[in-house]
């Protein structure tokens, strides 16, 4: 898979994913360390990359935009700060989430929990559950 690692995460996450055979770049690799969330979304969509972040604003942005790409993987727990742990969690989740991520999804990862939601997030889907 192709990943774009957001600034809140270490560049070592991209290195770990590349070591596992994935195409992964960190926003620093593009000189986007101060880029807006919109700019990061645009780059990820242009290159068919999954955004990997700890920035929960991406979930809100997806809901507001009502689009199916880019897909996003979010870390939601402070206990997962080590890059090695984050890489291991992504790799463990991919067998059950890869197809959805390719279609368009947001995946929220915690140490012992995974939540997956298909994109786009629309008002009607929100109201109907």
Task: Please provide the spans of the model-predicted regions.
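N-terminal beta1-alpha1 ligand-phosphate binding loop
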Residues: 2-12
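Mid-chain, well-packed structural core segment of small domains
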Residues: 59-94
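Charged phosphate-binding loop/patch that engages nucleotide di/tri-phosphates or the phosphate backbone
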Residues: 96-129
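Short helix-loop-beta junction
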Residues: 16-24
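Acidic, metal-binding active-site segment of PIN/NYN-like and related structure-specific nucleases
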Residues: 44-62
């Amino acid at each position: 898979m192709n990943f774009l690692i957001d600034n809140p995460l270490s560049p070592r996450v991209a290195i770990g994913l590349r070591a596992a055979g994935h195409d992964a770049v960190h926003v620093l690799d593009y000189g986007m360390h101060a880029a807006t969330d919109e700019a990061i979304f645009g780059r990820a969509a242009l290159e068919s990359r999954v955004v990997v972040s700890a920035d929960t604003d991406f979930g809100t942005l997806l809901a507001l935009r009502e689009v199916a790409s880019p897909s996003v993987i979010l870390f939601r727990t402070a206990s997962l700060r080590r890059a090695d742990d984050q890489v291991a969690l992504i790799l463990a989740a991919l067998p059950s989430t890869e197809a959805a991520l390719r279609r368009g999804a947001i995946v929220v990862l915690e140490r012992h929990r995974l939540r997956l939601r298909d994109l786009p997030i629309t008002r009607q889907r929100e109201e109907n559950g």
